[in-house]
Amino acid sequence: MTFSEQPAIANTPSDTDTVPGVATPLTQTVTAAADRTTQAPYLRIENVRKTFGKFVALKDIYLDVYPGEFVCLLGPSGCGKTTLLRIIAGLEQQTQGRVLQGGKDVSHLPPSMRDFGIVFQSYALFPNLSAIQNVAYGLQNQKVPKAQIETRVSELLDMVGLGGMGHKYPAQLSGGQQQRVALARALALSPGLLLLDEPLSALDAQVRIRLRAEITDLQRRLGITTVMVTHDQAEALAMADRIVVMDKGYIAQVGTPHSVYQHPTSPFVANFIGVMNFLDGVVEADDTVRCGNILLTAPHNTVPPGQAVVIALRPEDMRVIDTPSATPVPNQVKAEVLGREFLGAGYRLDLTLEGNARQPIALEISANRARAMGVESLTALTIQLPPEMIRVFPKENP
């Protein structure tokens, strides 16, 4: 899929299209904003801190989410992402700071007074109600006329791929179908904000991949501002306009999926997003790092000479050199093959570098390339660590 830098914004319908308590037509066109930075944020998290006794769960969080944007809160267990989502929803009260939605301070409003729909990991459907009744529940509480409820529920069930299944009860539906009902229910009242609390983590792999594509497509079509919590890197990379990487209660990095993956700002982010090789080294010159007995050119280095560093390089970014080049190849290194792992579409080779055998690294190659190389019997090869792909970080004290 394409990772867009711009949010999706729904065209404003005419007054005649708007019915209180019922969504605007689902076929409305969605356009991309020319530049989201020119818009006011729809959701603003301002200096939010949360403590549980002496434990600090969130440390002075600042975050803007723009209209129509899909933002993923990504991080390991205990990083604070779910606590932040609960504060946005009003299910948890922040210790300090403010939450603003649509320019309005909602920091101390109860969930019932906030404008959002939410989907939980556990679906949270009423087991004694059919799919139709679950989706209609909020509309009935808002006293929407029966005919409009029927039309709206039918539209929503069709939209999530459950047309003709509204009579079924949760126990008669698969996990993916139940989550679709939960999503339709969250959208029933046309909220300004959609919150997703690890909505796919309870599903099997194939259903999860299919449903994440459906949710992303639906969010783009409706242009609804969305915040999703996940610990799954693949979900965040595939679905988000921007990823907020969290660690130990603070925001480690915010950026597009491409920028966070290709340009991590810390070893934590580099290691948490995807697979990363790390080598210890010392900066010898502005663009040169020594790792063991290997001198590597690193043009992106900003660490002063003499400082201990960690260099990072992704397995798929390294290159195999099949034949000698007429011109010198920077960062060319001989390597011994320690092991190989078949990944389906390719192989991951475990290597040690000549001149730095104490730190094994991984190299990923396509299945076609692996067959051409005779990977099953391969014991040694020559590789390049491309200078432009190397990231250099100051070595952190243990």
Regions found by a protein language model. Give the residues of each.
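ABC ATPase nucleotide-binding domains
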Residues: F70, L109-F268
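Non-catalytic connector elements of ABC transporters
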Residues: T2-L26, T31, M276, D287-P398
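Helix-to-loop junction immediately C-terminal to a conserved catalytic motif
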Residues: A89
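Conserved ABC transporter NBD signature motif
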Residues: G97-D105
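The feature captures the beta-strand-to-loop junction immediately N-terminal to the Walker
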Residues: L74-P76
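Conserved coupling/switch loops of ABC nucleotide-binding domains, chiefly the family-specific signature
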Residues: T95-R98, Q148, K248, D280
